[in-house]
């Protein structure tokens, strides 16, 4: 059993005969025991794992919930929130679909959608096991942008079927955030959804990463006084994130001929057959 208060942890064994106290340094992700002895890597990993499980389980399982934005304290409120009052909002949306942004939460609601085929450093763990990650993204949306999120985990690997499922949810959301879908499927899915849907479709693993990397490289080059058009770049990896980063850097002015892309089989080049 692990107890966590601030930066201090207490790990008890199952028989409750041993107590080990740790002090966790969240900034440097390191941990020392109460007597100031640095813990082993295995101890640190296990302590962090237990802390994460406690965080996800208590006091309420999971990390997100639905909270009403209107009061519901009496019969009048009930009549306005549901039948018969709700019919007025429905009728206005029938007259003009854009009224959905006035009378519903659609304009501030994003669907974080995955099929769990490329989750963080975990790989293809499936939709159910990916749910904690999608909930975590919902926490980030709400905390840092005030945007509400429904996490949608879909048990479907066929790209065309996945496109159909996601596109069918357009009336619910103001935007779609594709998350942790394997390459090259993610490129195809995003492109088709953008062509088909009338709301923003954003693939976080591509464009979110590209924005951060692009900003870091541009600012780093400013610090050292170098020109983006004159430097050479080698990437380690040729997945969705890497290719999106390169696309943005080229748009920002980096010449394609100054870029070398590598993966498990070495340098990627036209005509290569291995792992292509």
Would you name each region that the model predicts?
Residues 1-13:
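Single conserved hydrophobic/aromatic residue that forms the stacking wall/gate
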Residues 4-5, 105-107, 229:
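Short loop/turn elements that form and flank the Walker-type P-loop nucleotide-binding site
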Residues 19:
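Cationic, low-complexity basic patches in intrinsically disordered or flexible, solvent-exposed regions
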Residues 24-26:
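Tryptophan (W) side chains
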């Amino acid at each position: 059993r692990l107890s966590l208060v601030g930066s201090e942890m207490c790990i008890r064994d199952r028989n409750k005969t041993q107590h080990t106290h740790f002090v966790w340094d969240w900034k440097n992700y390191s941990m020392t025991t109460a007597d100031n002895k640095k813990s082993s890597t295995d101890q640190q990993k296990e302590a962090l794992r237990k802390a994460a499980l406690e965080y996800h389980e208590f006091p309420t399982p999971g990390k997100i919930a639905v909270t009403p934005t209107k009061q519901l304290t009496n019969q009048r409120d009930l009549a306005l929130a549901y039948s018969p009052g709700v019919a007025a909002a429905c009728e206005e949306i029938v007259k003009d679909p854009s009224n959905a942004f006035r009378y519903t939460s659609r304009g501030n609601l994003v669907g974080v959608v995955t099929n769990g085929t490329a989750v963080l450093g975990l790989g293809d763990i499936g939709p159910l096991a990916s749910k904690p990650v999608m909930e975590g993204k919902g926490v980030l949306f709400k905390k840092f942008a005030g945007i509400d999120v429904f996490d949608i985990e879909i048990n479907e690997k066929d790209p065309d079927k996945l496109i159909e499922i996601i596109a069918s949810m357009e009336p619910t959301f103001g935007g779609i955030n594709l998350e942790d879908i394997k390459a090259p499927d993610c490129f195809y899915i995003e492109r088709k959804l953008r062509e088909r849907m009338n709301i923003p479709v954003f693939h976080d693993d591509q464009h979110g990463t590209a924005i951060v990397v692009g900003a870091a490289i541009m600012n780093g080059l400013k610090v050292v006084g170098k020109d983006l058009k004159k430097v050479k770049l080698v990437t380690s990896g040729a997945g969705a994130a890497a290719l999106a980063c390169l696309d943005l850097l080229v748009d920002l002015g980096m010449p394609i001929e100054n870029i070398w892309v590598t993966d498990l089989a070495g340098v990627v080049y036209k005509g290569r057959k291995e792992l292509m």
